[in-house]
Regions:
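Hydrophobic transmembrane alpha-helical segments in integral membrane proteins
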Residues: 1-13
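Cytosolic-facing loops and C-terminal tails of multi-pass membrane proteins
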Residues: 230-272
Length: 272
C-alpha cells in the first residue's frame, strides 16, 4: 500500500471504531440529528480532500519525499538515527499544530474559517472532519513549510499524519471513559473529555485545551483547563452565534466566513 492508502486504512478503522463506541458508551446527549450532521461533516471532509489534491497533490508525505530528494531541511544535514528523527518529528510537528490552533483562535481573520469547526451543535467523531476547505489549505501550506524546514523522512511524516488523524477522531468522539483512565491518559494525550471543554460555548473554555494529540503543550503553556463550569454531560457545545440546525447546513458552512461577522475569540487578560 502507498502512503495515502495506509492513512486511509488507519482513518477508516479509527472512525468506525469510535462511531461504534459512541452508540454503546455515549458521553454527551445530542441536540441535533446525528445522521444529518454525519452527512454534512463527511461532505466537508470530501470537499477538503479534493481541494488538497487539487492544490498540493501528494500533500505532506509527498513534501517530505520532495525535500529528501533535494537534501532540504535540518534532518537531511544532521543524519541522525531514523528512530530519533521520527520521535522528534512527531513531537515538533505536534507542538506546531498546537501553536497553529492557538493562532486561529487569536486572529479574527483565521477565526472566521475555524468557526466552521466550532459551529457543530454536537461533538462526535465526525466533528474531527469538520473544517472549512480554506482552513485546510492554509493548514497544509503551513505543514509543508515546516516539513521543508525540518527535513523529516517520508515515514516520519506518515507516522505523524496517522497519529494526528487518529487522535483528532478520538479526541472529538462522544464516548465515555472511566474517570480514572481519563485522568491517567490526560497526563500524556488529549482525551475526549479534555477536548470537549474546548468546544464549549463558554469563551474562556473555547480558548483552552488546544491540543489534538499530546496534552503537555496545554499544561506547559498555561492553556489547560481540567474541568468545565458545567459537568461534562451538560456542557453546551458550539458557538453562541449559531444555535439552530438550519444555520449550519453544508451551504451555510461553506459561506460562513464570508457572510457572517463572528465574535472575536482572541484572548483578553480577564479571559485567560
Amino acid at each position: 500500500m502507498d502512503a495515502n492508502q495506509i492513512r486511509f486504512a488507519i482513518f477508516l478503522a479509527v472512525f468506525l471504531l469510535m462511531l461504534g463506541l459512541e452508540s454503546i458508551i455515549q458521553r454527551h446527549p445530542t441536540v441535533d440529528a446525528k445522521t444529518r450532521r454525519l452527512k454534512i461533516n463527511l461532505a466537508l471532509a470530501g470537499i477538503d480532500i479534493l481541494v488538497v489534491r487539487l492544490f498540493f497533490g501528494a500533500a505532506a508525505v509527498g513534501a517530505a519525499q520532495f525535500a529528501g530528494e533535494r537534501g532540504w531541511g535540518l534532518f537531511n544535514y544532521l543524519q541522525w538515527p531514523e528512530g530519533l528523527e521520527i520521535f522528534l518529528c512527531v513531537v515538533f510537528l505536534d507542538l506546531m499544530i498546537y501553536i497553529q490552533h492557538v493562532v486561529v483562535h487569536m486572529i479574527p481573520f483565521f477565526w472566521r474559517f475555524h468557526i466552521v469547526h466550532h459551529s457543530d451543535l454536537d461533538l462526535d467523531v465526525s466533528s474531527g472532519l469538520r473544517f472549512h476547505p480554506i482552513e485546510i489549505l492554509g493548514s497544509m501550506l503551513f505543514k509543508i513549510g515546516l516539513i521543508f524546514a525540518l527535513g523529516p523522512s517520508a515515514i516520519a511524516v506518515l507516522i505523524f499524519e496517522a497519529i494526528l488523524n487518529g487522535m483528532a477522531l478520538f479526541s472529538h468522539s462522544n464516548i465515555t471513559l472511566p474517570e480514572s483512565l481519563d485522568r491517567l491518559l490526560r497526563y500524556v494525550i488529549v482525551t475526549p473529555d479534555m477536548h470537549r471543554i474546548h468546544h464549549s460555548v463558554e469563551k474562556r473554555e473555547t480558548n483552552s485545551n488546544y491540543g489534538f494529540n499530546l496534552s503537555i503543550w496545554d499544561r506547559a503553556l498555561g492553556t489547560y483547563i481540567h474541568d468545565a463550569l458545567k459537568p461534562q454531560p451538560r456542557i453546551i457545545i458550539g458557538v453562541s452565534q449559531f444555535r439552530a440546525s438550519e444555520e449550519v447546513s453544508l451551504k451555510n458552512l461553506l459561506m460562513m466566513p464570508f457572510r457572517e461577522v463572528p465574535e472575536n475569540h482572541s484572548f483578553s487578560p480577564e479571559e485567560k
